[in-house]
């Protein structure tokens, strides 16, 4: 495994560990570079029936754009549809880790997806709060 893949794997393992510490059931399922034919997101996390799916991408420069190839994006979007999960692009840049809802990504003319540096994302704590807000129950849920 080259240094770039090792660094990306380390970031994914760190996210998995942090989500697990927050009470999620988490699976790391990296498929890039494998012979796998069915695209799946890098991280699948579940908590009380709420599913979040994270496709991780990283860049060395803070201002660079992050691209997801059309074929890969279509596959993980279909996975999200089938699972009922919320799909996020996890973006790791120097000093930055954010999670962008996939629907906020821009499409290029060739159908690829791109995250510009201006797109707002959630930090890990905000992502956890988003999930916890979905699972919080009020008395109305039981009436």
Swiss-Prot record:
Sites annotated Transition state stabilizer: 57
UniProt cofactor note: Binds 1 Mg(2+) ion per subunit.
UniProt family annotation: Belongs to the Holliday junction resolvase Hjc family.
Descriptive protein name: Crossover junction endodeoxyribonuclease Hjc
PANTHER family noted in UniProt: HOLLIDAY JUNCTION RESOLVASE HJC (PTHR39651:SF1)
This enzyme's EC code(s): 3.1.21.10
Catalytic residue positions: 32
Residues binding Mg(2+), per UniProt: 12, 42, 55
InterPro entries noted in UniProt: Hjc, Hjc_arc, Restrct_endonuc-II-like, tRNA_endonuc-like_dom_sf
Function: A structure-specific endonuclease that resolves Holliday junction (HJ) intermediates during genetic recombination; may have some degree of sequence preference in a mobile junction. Cleaves 4-way DNA junctions introducing paired nicks in opposing strands, leaving a 5'-terminal phosphate and a 3'-terminal hydroxyl group that are subsequently ligated to produce recombinant products. Can cleave all 4 strands 3 bases 3' of the junction center. Cleaves both mobile and immobile junctions. Modifies the structure of the 4-way DNA junction, a model Holliday junction structure.
CDD domains: Holliday_junction_resolvase
Alphabetical keyword list: DNA damage, DNA recombination, DNA repair, DNA-binding, Endonuclease, Hydrolase, Magnesium, Metal-binding, Nuclease
Activity-regulation annotation: Autoinhibits at very high concentrations, possibly because of extreme junction distortion. Inhibition (and activity at low concentrations of enzyme) is stimulated by dsDNA and Sso7d. Activity stimulated by PCNA subunit PCNA1.
